[in-house]
Amino acid sequence: MVNPIIKEAKEKMKKTLERIEDELRKMRTGKPSPAILEEIKVDYYGVPTPVNQLATISVSEERTLVIKPWDKSVLSLIEKAINASDLGLNPINDGNVIRLVFPSPTTEQREKWVKKAKEIVEEGKIAIRNIRRDILKKIKEDQKEGKIPEDDAKRLENEIQKLTDEFIENLDKVFEIKKEEIMEF
């Protein structure tokens, strides 16, 4: 049976890893990805609505995203929202679809993106270490109160450290994959 303290730590660390993976997925790289539009909202009948709820978004060719709205009346709204975003892309509206052409990024841009990815992963590592610190503090308190024998406390501390090392290693792997994706020509 898994100790509830270990289970709690694992769940929190897993959520942190998932959050970091999600942030990295939304990051702009040299390749077009529908995920980069997830944060862009369009004012649709007074309600801020994500673009992916108003249109089909697909990758066409190597460097182009195609946004095909289900309601043609939102084409100009989607175009305005993309222009107002910090994506740095110029939407091409042909009356039926919007095309986003991704220019080949410079080496300098790629290095900037790698640096940003590294910062995101570092935030994840800090969050995981904070989870470890909080759980170890809880174990120490339980030991002082006599809820956990000293041997069990040491065993739990070792398990928490192994878990921490495992999740930090996973974050490093996620970063390396993202770095390769960014630096790929």
UniProtKB/Swiss-Prot annotation:
One Pfam match: RRF
Gene Ontology molecular function: any one: ribosomal large subunit binding
Subcellular localization(s) per the UniProt record: Cytoplasm
A single GO cellular-component term on record: cytoplasm
GO terms classed as biological process: translational termination
Predominant place of localization: cytoplasm
Keywords: Cytoplasm, Protein biosynthesis
Record-linked PANTHER family: MITOCHONDRIAL RIBOSOME RECYCLING FACTOR PSEUDO 1, RIBOSOME RECYCLING FACTOR
Function comment: Responsible for the release of ribosomes from messenger RNA at the termination of protein biosynthesis. May increase the efficiency of translation by recycling ribosomes from one round of translation to another.
Cross-referenced HAMAP family: RRF (MF_00040)
The name this protein goes by in its record: Ribosome-recycling factor
Species, as recorded: Thermotoga petrophila (strain ATCC BAA-488 / DSM 13995 / JCM 10881 / RKU-1)
